[in-house]
């Protein structure tokens, strides 16, 4: 009988409390936490047949599906902290018949599906293995084949995982440096590296490609006016009129109602992305 394929698990904490070290306006920080989670989940979902999210946010599954991410979400059910949440997710995955669990952090905006598959293949000789982050101190992925996941994320997690018996997967074993799978994001410097590697669609929508950095955050109000090309105009909090292309509304908004206030990032007088 063929070995069942691997399944992935990610634990997501409320966006309001995520990425507190990013020195950007709070609405943009929250948006970045969301888009990075979306890009991490999108890559994992393209590589694996099943992905489970563990969270205490009741509306999260519906929000993810509206964003185009079809994954199952289960409650933390009193399992406080990332390690308890991941352990709960791993138990559910095993009960569903999957022999291999791939636990991943939710702040890998540059993650590519092929890197996930490379890591999965390199992990086969080991019961438990992990991918250290770019600093070598933390962990971005932990894999377990037919054994307990026993996650030790947060802090000096690479050393903790190694001490627990998990093997650190090297670039030589993987066959690639997989910089995208090691670049988690906590600071602006981390984000700059991730953008340089190439981030997923959700995070990329916030990037001004002329500068290679985030667009400028603006709180905008939709108006009834349009420019010469028929595109809707919005007014910034400082009174400037800028263009709101339909494409900037993404999956969350079909249109901006007159008088509606939105968060946004803009560049050169055009909104790059807008959200509620």
How should each PLM-predicted stretch be described?
Residues 249-265:
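Short nucleic-acid-contacting surface segments enriched for D/E, G, S/T with interspersed K/R
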Residues 162-214:
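Conserved alpha/beta core of the MobA/IspD/sugar-nucleotide pyrophosphorylase nucleotidyltransferase superfamily
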Residues 110-136:
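Conserved donor-nucleotide/metal-binding helix-loop-beta segment in metal-dependent transferases, i.e.
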Residues 266-276:
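OB-fold/S1-family single-stranded nucleic acid-binding modules
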Residues 33-49:
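A short, N-terminal amphipathic alpha-helix
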Residues 1-22:
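N-terminal nucleotide-binding beta1-loop-alpha1 segment
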Residues 212-229:
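Structural detector for short beta-strands of small beta-barrel domains
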Residues 65-101, 157-159:
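Short phosphate-binding loop-to-helix
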């Amino acid at each position: 009988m063929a070995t069942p394929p691997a399944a992935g698990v990610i634990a997501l904490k409320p966006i309001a409390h995520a990425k507190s070290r990013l020195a950007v306006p709070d609405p943009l920080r929250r948006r970045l936490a969301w888009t990075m989670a979306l890009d991490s989940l999108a890559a994992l979902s393209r590589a694996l047949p099943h992905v489970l999210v563990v969270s205490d946010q009741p509306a999260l599954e519906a929000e993810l599906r509206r964003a185009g991410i079809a994954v199952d979400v289960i409650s933390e059910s009193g399992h406080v902290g990332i390690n308890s949440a991941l352990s709960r997710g791993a138990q559910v995955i095993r009960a569903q018949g999957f022999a291999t669990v791939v636990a991943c952090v939710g702040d890998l905006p540059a993650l590519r599906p092929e890197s996930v598959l490379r890591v999965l293949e390199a992990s086969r000789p080991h019961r438990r293995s992990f991918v250290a982050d770019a600093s070598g101190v933390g962990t971005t992925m932990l894999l377990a084949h037919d054994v307990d996941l026993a996650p030790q994320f947060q802090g000096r997690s690479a050393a903790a995982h190694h001490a627990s018996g998990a093997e650190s997967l090297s670039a030589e074993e993987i066959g690639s440096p997989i910089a995208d799978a090691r670049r988690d994001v906590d600071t602006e410097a981390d984000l700059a590296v991730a953008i340089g590697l190439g981030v997923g669609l959700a995070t990329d929508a916030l990037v001004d490609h002329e500068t290679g950095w985030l667009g400028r955050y603006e709180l905008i109000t939709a108006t009834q006016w349009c420019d010469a090309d028929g595109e809707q105009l919005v007014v910034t909090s400082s009174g400037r009129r800028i263009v709101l292309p339909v494409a900037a509304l993404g999956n969350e908004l079909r249109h901006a109602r007159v008088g509606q206030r939105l968060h946004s990032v803009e560049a050169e007088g055009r909104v790059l992305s807008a959200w509620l």
